[in-house]
Amino acid sequence: MADCPYARCIQERRHIRRELLRWTKNMVFVVGLERVAEELMGRRRWKQYQDTLYSGTRSSESLTAQAHHRLYPAFSSSCDPVPGNLEQIGSRPLHPPASSTSLPATITTTTTTTTTTTATAAATATTTATGLIKQETLQRHHHLQNHHHHLQSTAVQDHHRPYQQQQQQQQRQQQRQEERRLRPDEIKVEVGEDEFANGGAARDESKAGSTDASTPATVTTTGATTTLPAASATGTGPATPSAVVATSNATAAMTTGTTTIPTRRLRKRRQNDGEGADDRDDDEENEEEEDGRGQSEAEKRLKLDEDADGAVSPLRREKDRGSREYPTSNATDTDGTKERTEEVALDRTPVTQGLLRVKKEEELQEAPSCGGGPTILTTPGLDSDGIRLPCREVEAAATARNVVAPFLIGSRRTSPPPEDWKPLDKCYFCLDGKLPHDDQPPLSPQSDSSSSSRSAESPMSVQVDPMAASVVAAALTGTYPTLLPQWCLPPREAPLVGVQPHQDSATPADQPLDLSAKPKNSQDNNISLLEQQKIPLRMTAGIDPKSIFNSGYRPKPRMSGPVAAVAAAAVAAAGVGGVPVVGAGGGRRAYTEEELQAALRDIQSGKLGTRRAAVIYGIPRSTLRNKVYKLAMERERDASLSSTHSHPHEPGAPATTITTITTTTTTTTTTTTTTTTPNTTQNASATTPPPQVDEVDDKELSGAEEEKEVEKALLKPLLSLEDLVRFSTLEGSGGDSLRTLLQRGQETGAEWPGLEHANIGPYIQKMIAAAAPFKGMETQDYRIPEVMRRLMSEDKRLSKSVNGDQSQPPHQQLHHHQSTHPQAQAQAQPQQQQQQQQQQPQQQQQQQQQQQQQQRGPMTNDDFNPNIEEEASDSAQGRAILKIPSYKPASTPGCSSKNGEPTSAAFAQGFATAASSPGLLERASPAFSGTSSPTNSLVGKTVAVNFRDVIAKSISVKFQEGQTVSGGGMGGCQPGGVVQSQQPIMTDPSPFKRGRYTPPQPANAQQGQAQAQAKPQSQEANKPKPATGGKGTRPKRGKYRNYDRDSLVEAVRAVQRGEMSVHRAGSYYGVPHSTLEYKVKERHLMRPRKRDQKQSDDKTKETSTVTAAAAATNIRPGTADNKPQLKPQKPFTSPGGIPGPNGIKMPSFMEGMPHLPFTPFNFWNPPPFMPSPFMAGAPNVPTILPEQYFATSRIRGLQEQQRNAAMVQQQQQQQQQQQQQQQQQQQQQQQQQHQAREREGVGAGIAETSAGTSNSRGAAQMSKVPRDVSEGIYDGSGANGSFLDNLIRSSLETGIPRDQRAMTEARNQQQQASSQQQIPESMRSKALIDQLCRNSRRTPVPRLAQDSSEDESYRGPSASGGRPVPERPERVPTVDLSPSPSDRGRNDDGSDRLTSPPTPLSISRAGSRDEDSTRDSTKLDRSSREREVHNGGQQEDRDRKTLTSAPQQPQQQQQQQQQQQQQQQQLNHYPDLHNLYAVPTDKKSACDSKLIVDHSSQKTQQQQPQQQQQQQQQQQPQQQSQQPQQQQPQPQQQQQQQQQQQPQQQQKEYGAVSGLVVQLQRGYNSGNNRSGEQANSQQQQQQQSGEPVIGMEDSVEQ
């Protein structure tokens, strides 16, 4: 099968498909690559056979020099346009040279081209025993990398200039073959001129004869297509026709080698030779060889380089010559040549690696330049025409010709026609699963892990050749958008670029991260491998190929481990095939360690089964299974140890850490390279670093490959950055939304429970790699890259924590990373922030990671933060595939107390908390970040280890304690109900899988949180059994009920969303696919949802009441609050924040907050990151905000409409009553709030972000009765209904604090916090319809007007202290965020909000970046709402203008707002987070329009209540200064203020959730002060005119 090109091609196709699936979910691209692979396979086989036939048949046909020249003119004509266009050079010049490839100068051409390119050196080494040419070739190759453009233009000029001369000279050369050392220009021109003179007939003849001469010439032509005249001259008199024929054949071979050259060449050849198959093959070959053959050519160059470097010995030259000759025989089949060349390349892979990469880019740019990949593509592209050969190369080629030409001619065999697959002499399975020429990853994972020496040698070119070449071509072409870059990289441009420069500087020689530097091209994100290939091509100009070699080699060591690293280093040092072709696997093994690791990664990630992996990677299935189980057992054992104490996060934390550190130097480097740079290195199997990471994670996670697959799917999950980016892209404001999400994630602590670091790390690294082109733009302004880095750092820390290195305090490491060079900074900042969240345990993890990185010396640059962060995950994962520091189910830090080990559910919950409310997490930092810091570190770290731990060991404990802890223990665990509730959420996610998969769990946990807690013990019984033990971990057949309903729900949703097939979802979520098939149908899914929701509803109502009571008792939900919260959040847990990435689970959204972090990922509209809801209204806010956040605009709209119909009357009545009560309360509250805000200036923010004060809780309870009624009316399912009602009501009724009447006293102290909580619960019954019927609520437009004036007076009392005001502005943005995602996005700025639902509001709030800006943002919201109401979408600009130009309100308000901002920032720590991630003004300006627009749209959709509250908040300072201006009755003002306070509180929480928003807000401080003033004046108008215009129903409809 190995010798069968078809089998090899099939494997290549599989590999391509696998890598494409890994790297991109872009089916178009996948299909394209698959088609390319198929065509390549077919073409290769046909080309090899036909080339052999043609070379054998036509080798006898000697074309005259004129015929050869005729061939050349076509090339020459093609080459003429080439100089201007590298791509043309790659395509057009290659084609003409392909037709007239100077195979007449077959040997000389080969030598010249080889000299020109690596192939020149290879040909020289092959034909000539001179090592000088080899060195020259390598040197020239490097020079060409840097100067190929220059050479190309020079060669083109020379080509045009000497055409006539060269025609004559070529004729003379053919006559006098010894005078082969014509100037490259002359040689090329001569060929071109002859071709021009002798048009197509000679070309046909040349083709006919060229095939014959092509055998000898193919070797040479592959090496040097440019030296056509030289080849002609080289060919002795008798050989001149032969040489011409060889030139034709060389052209054909070059065509094969070069994508573009092959096309024309093959077309002409088809015309001349009637090669219909070649026509098809070459057309596609041009497509694929542009990609695949560009790489094939690169690989040919590799082989030629190997010939030059490694084949110095005559025997080797002979062998190489045979190889080349054989490909020449397959003149058209560059693949044959490539395989030959690769055969040589295997020997020379180390040297070729850099050359290959460089040339690949050249090939990609100029790939067509010369079919013989070795030719420098820029000049060689012309070289194939005889134009392109640079002078040095020509000289070297001439030398090679003179020395080698006779030898080659004498020894050049008329391509042994039927000698089908000489390159395949060793089956790819035998050759470490790689064909010598098939090193190219397309062969299959072999290339990835096949021979570590080989991967190290040419990780990019060898591994990725066919598919990677196609991908690279596509990337270069921009065929498919870079998956991550476009989505995630709006912010990535600056920060990722910032990371990239370090990558670039360090990667060139040192690091596997060189691949990362290579993927710097934006397209690189899609296919790291291809990117690496392509980027080295692009980077080669800047990066020395040798550096690339080194970096390429390093990734290899990582792949092969320390031995591989040594071998790779040796190879890099030798520059020749220092690593045996067999690879690191060893002579006795047909597979390399790298392949084994790649296979294990695939298996663990669930990408492959052991059976398929065994076939693909050529590794015995028994070996794979043994390794997988061994890893799983080790992981579980270590996880058990880790679960024993939540600190050791990974199974073999210390021991494995040392091993991993060593392996990390090699394997981690490999993994990092695999993830980022190594993607190229692990092209075939590691083409998708995330899969590798996931594979590694799965290994860690599960002992059973099946379970591993599920685990990987789950780990992969939730929201892979790809999904996140994809949704962000779909959102339209992908950058902002993703930025907000990621930044909030940073605030959260950088470890996103929902995001698998294994997934995110590779994805982030892809992002960073894609941002590499922007590395010059490095700024930490873009916090997404920082967050991404932090995610990667989190993985690193997880690895470190697993390794047990948790020494540095978070801030120390934070500062250490920040103070460290940007690379370390990029690494460190994510780690810093994560560590800030995770604090010392993760700080220690980070330190250990840093130590590991230091230990990985070469990986310092490899440790390029994204890479290293990913490397942290990969390093933990890649070091030992066993180790997957992706998220083990670490309980939230607070919930770490559950089992002492974080559960994936806890982790997801923690992340939900962190993501949901960064500020609150900061506030809860002691409990969530601080208390949970070990757990949070575990959250990231233990997720991999604890997936197994928690599932095997802790699942029982978790579910036992989880029920207890999540029921009541969580309260103790968490500082507030927020973290605690999240912990239960996380708890369920951990159990919901076989126990291994935390990430998907949160979604499942969200739906089944209540169930999960109800059935934790049953799950304990079930899951520990599958999870515990190496072999016991694999779920046994027949344990069909062993899956969590949450997992089932999540799987069903994933299938329904079209994210996965039933089978994949079944394995991914660990549920039987047969069951899943039935459940996928809506009716089946609805039943579990209803049950989950009913449980959630019951618990939510329960919890709302209990939480309200607890809130009344505790400012932050205490244990009692947490317990209710947990129950309300059990619905949240059902969604399980993590599943969001897989797809937003609407029911899960409704059911539980934990899904939020992922929901924002999925839908940037809902992304008003659940954090604030959790943070602010522990039980109530989470209940309310989850609806707002989780309920997509659609769901919210539908539910709101339903509730509208049912509750309009009730709400209106309640609104009237509440308004009256609120007016009274607000009057009282204005006084009380003034005092309370002064008191709460410091504490109110905390109280607000806490579950609200006890009064707010009490009010929430009181209002929950109507809420329960409305829930009963609206949603029998409770979880969805109650949460949606709460969310919708809170978002809709943010302006209508019905609870305020009950909370009059509570509001004095807690108005903001209680607004959020009270409104959610009390508004649930009334406010929902009132908000839905915002018109009724907006109907009191005077309120808005009053709000404008009263907001000040309302704020006046509270803002008099100046502290309450800051709290509210903080919330204002938060409010905008929370309602805006649900309301504004749908109603007013559906598009904007959809674009960046959480970010826009927070960014509109961010637009008024300060707390001043926040209050101003409320003003802006009003003004923008008003404008939007009046002007539609133009209010954005007006709002901005208002911000900038119309400071109509007293600066007193601004100052008060600023004070409020400062105070709130202090209180919330969320502003501090923002300070940590301060967004520069540029970013603000960049986000301003979108943010403001979103803000206005959100405000409009939130509509007047939020605006009123915001205005009140904003205007409270104004009111303080302008109380005389207050013309509206205070009761209404108070009501409005309360209403505004609720949204503000929510917004404040959202602001805490969305650090980015706060950052933007801070950035917008100055602008927002103005805008706040202006907005106040305008907001009054808006209140009057705009408020009634847009109603909640409008937002619901939208």
From Swiss-Prot:
Gene3D superfamilies named among the record's database cross-references: Homeodomain-like
GO-annotated molecular function: sequence-specific DNA binding
Composition-biased stretches (Gly residues): 965-975
Main localization of the protein described in the UniProt heading: nucleus
Name of this chain's protein: Mushroom body large-type Kenyon cell-specific protein 1
Highest taxon above the source species: Eukaryota
Pfam families: HTH_psq
Biased composition (Low complexity): 164-174, 210-263, 445-461, 653-687, 820-855, 1003-1021, 1103-1120, 1309-1318, 1447-1466, 1501-1547
Record's keyword terms, sorted: Activator, DNA-binding, Nucleus, Phosphoprotein, Repeat, Transcription, Transcription regulation
Organism: Apis mellifera
